[in-house]
């Protein structure tokens, strides 16, 4: 009896289960479960793939930025190309140096010519007699480089002292030291006796005349004298022949 009763109970339970959940509904439920699970799995896979792609892109960007920063850091130390550039710059500087040397040579030549002209002027002043009026050396025009400082400053001072002495001596000068042009009116003619008025050299009228003549001579521009290497002057010797090699 027990077995039969148990069998009947299982049947009733099955019928009750079938009534509550029929087989079609059960199959649909299982299908929906499978679909929902598969959709969830697909979504998880998609998100994982997207995250993996994002990580790969970020790694690529980081690697690119790191490589760029490394290349920029390597530029700062001197490379062989920069050393060659420095060598080229040094070569350019060495090439530019001869121009400065040429400029210095030209400047030396100008100073030599100036010293020669000053020596010539000294010799000319020494050859002239002491009674002749001396003129102050003309100041040379200022170059672009600035005013040229005269080297023979003592010579200029001596000239000014001589001029001052001549000015002081001009009223008291004797007829023997006066220039030859002033001696002619003062020299006595033949057969005439000297008067006491003529003998007085301190006459203001006579002292004014040599002063005026001296001033005229000072105002006249002095012709530049050049020393010839040959003893004979070119006027006596004639035109200088040109030698053609």
Swiss-Prot record:
Post-translational modifications: Binds keratan sulfate chains.
GO CC term (a single one): cytoplasm
UniProt keyword list: Cleavage on pair of basic residues, Cushing syndrome, Cytoplasmic vesicle, Glycoprotein, Proteoglycan, Secreted, Signal
SS bond list: none
Major localisation: cytoplasm
A Gene Ontology biological process term: female pregnancy
Biased composition (Basic and acidic residues): 187-215
Biased composition range(s): Low complexity: 171-181
Biased composition (Acidic residues): 101-129
InterPro entries reported for this sequence: NESP55 (IPR009434)
Source organism, top-level taxon: Eukaryota
Similarity remark: Belongs to the NESP55 family.
Misc. comment: This protein is produced by a bicistronic gene which also produces the ALEX protein from an overlapping reading frame.
Disease cited in the entry: ACTH-independent macronodular adrenal hyperplasia 1: A rare adrenal defect characterized by multiple, bilateral, non-pigmented, benign, adrenocortical nodules. It results in excessive production of cortisol leading to ACTH-independent Cushing syndrome. Clinical manifestations of Cushing syndrome include facial and truncal obesity, abdominal striae, muscular weakness, osteoporosis, arterial hypertension, diabetes. Pseudohypoparathyroidism 1B: A disorder characterized by end-organ resistance to parathyroid hormone, hypocalcemia and hyperphosphatemia. Patients affected with PHP1B lack developmental defects characteristic of Albright hereditary osteodystrophy, and typically show no other endocrine abnormalities besides resistance to PTH.
Name assigned to this protein: Neuroendocrine secretory protein 55
Species of origin: Homo sapiens
């Amino acid at each position: 009896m027990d077995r039969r009763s148990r069998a009947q109970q299982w049947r009733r339970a099955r019928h009750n289960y079938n009534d509550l959940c029929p087989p079609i509904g059960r199959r649909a439920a299982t299908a929906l479960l499978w679909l929902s699970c598969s959709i969830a799995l697909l979504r998880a896979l998609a998100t994982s793939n997207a995250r993996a792609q994002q990580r790969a892109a970020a790694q690529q960007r980081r690697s690119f930025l790191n490589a760029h920063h490394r290349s920029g850091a390597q530029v700062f130390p001197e490379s062989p190309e920069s050393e060659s550039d420095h060598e080229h710059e040094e070569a350019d500087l060495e090439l530019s140096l001869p121009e400065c040397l040429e400029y210095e040579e030209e400047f030396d030549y100008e100073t030599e010519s100036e010293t020669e002209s000053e020596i010539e002027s000294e010799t000319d002043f020494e050859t002239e007699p002491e009674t002749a009026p001396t003129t102050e050396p003309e100041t040379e025009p200022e170059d672009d480089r600035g005013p040229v400082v005269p080297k023979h400053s003592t010579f200029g001072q001596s000239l000014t002292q001589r001029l001052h002495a001549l000015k002081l001596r001009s009223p008291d000068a004797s007829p023997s030291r006066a220039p030859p042009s002033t001696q002619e009116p003062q020299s006595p003619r033949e057969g005439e006796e000297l008067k006491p008025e003529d003998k007085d050299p301190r006459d203001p009228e006579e002292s004014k005349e040599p002063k005026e003549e001296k001033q005229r001579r000072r105002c006249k521009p002095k012709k530049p004298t050049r020393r010839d290497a040959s003893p004979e002057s070119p006027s006596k010797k004639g035109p200088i022949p040109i030698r053609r090699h």
